[in-house]
């Protein structure tokens, strides 16, 4: 059986067992869920600065995995349509406006102006030229900490989005299309990782990945939303909706692909 298109659960469990920082943050988050913190009532829109790291393999801008600025911008537009439920867009479905908007960063951590798009050749890291980046240590590909350390912006001031040519040696094809961590990691891993051809709504895209839903899905994870089938393996009774599945009571616990 091949790997699922979302590699978040595997990456999350691996880091949970190896990082005391990440485990502590997850424990704090679950405590917040259990306390059922009330929703803010002023509905102020939260603006999140985004830096997109295009980690290519030497291609010119706009060729192969070194995607164009236009493709990056299309991803941000579609992401906001989904999170803000923009009327008349593909995001205007059954969901709700979550009052979060994503904008390309305008300053670097050092305070200098930026477009919010950073390009770096990842082939200096062993294995990246051949297999891209590995979402977990037991899978093919370059070590993600080594690759992301070339470019990541540390701290909690930005959402790092890493665009890569391959994940786990999949040649940009099937298997994992993207992965994230459900909250801050405290190191270079922090953020969202996606295949270049599953990112955006225009540009170098593959069939079935033209609505930018992979980015929307993985950003949801980064904002601490789990799968509805998280840690479920049978049709047991739902029980406490704050501790089962995605820990959110507006969605029932489900089985993966079931």
Which residues fall in each region the model found?
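Solvent-exposed loop/turn segments at secondary-structure junctions
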Residues: 55-58, 108-110, 165-170, 198-201, ...
């Amino acid at each position: 059986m091949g790997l699922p298109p979302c590699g978040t659960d595997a990456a999350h469990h691996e880091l949970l067992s190896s990082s005391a920082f990440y485990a502590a943050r997850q424990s704090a988050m679950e405590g917040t869920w259990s306390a059922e913190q009330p929703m803010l009532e002023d509905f102020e829109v939260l603006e999140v600065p985004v830096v997109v790291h295009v980690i290519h393999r030497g291609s010119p801008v706009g060729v192969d995995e070194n995607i164009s600025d236009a493709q990056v911008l299309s991803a941000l537009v579609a992401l906001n349509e989904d999170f803000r439920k923009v009327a008349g867009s593909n995001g205007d479905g059954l969901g709700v406006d979550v009052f979060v908007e994503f904008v390309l960063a305008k300053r670097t951590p050092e305070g200098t102006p930026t477009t919010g798009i950073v390009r770096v050749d990842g082939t200096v890291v062993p294995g990246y030229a051949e297999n891209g980046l590995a979402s977990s240590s037991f899978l093919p590909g370059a070590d993600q900490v080594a690759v992301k350390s070339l470019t990541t912006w540390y701290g909690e001031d930005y959402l790092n989005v890493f665009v890569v040519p391959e994940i786990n040696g999949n040649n940009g094809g099937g298997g994992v299309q993207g992965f994230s961590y459900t909250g801050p990691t405290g190191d270079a891993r922090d953020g969202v990782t996606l295949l270049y051809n599953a990112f955006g709504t225009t540009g170098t895209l593959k069939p079935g990945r033209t609505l930018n839903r992979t980015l929307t899905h993985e950003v949801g994870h980064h904002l601490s939303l789990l799968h509805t089938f998280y840690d479920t393996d049978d049709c047991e009774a739902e029980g406490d909706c704050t501790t089962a599945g995605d820990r959110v009571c507006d969605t029932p616990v489900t089985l993966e692909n079931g």
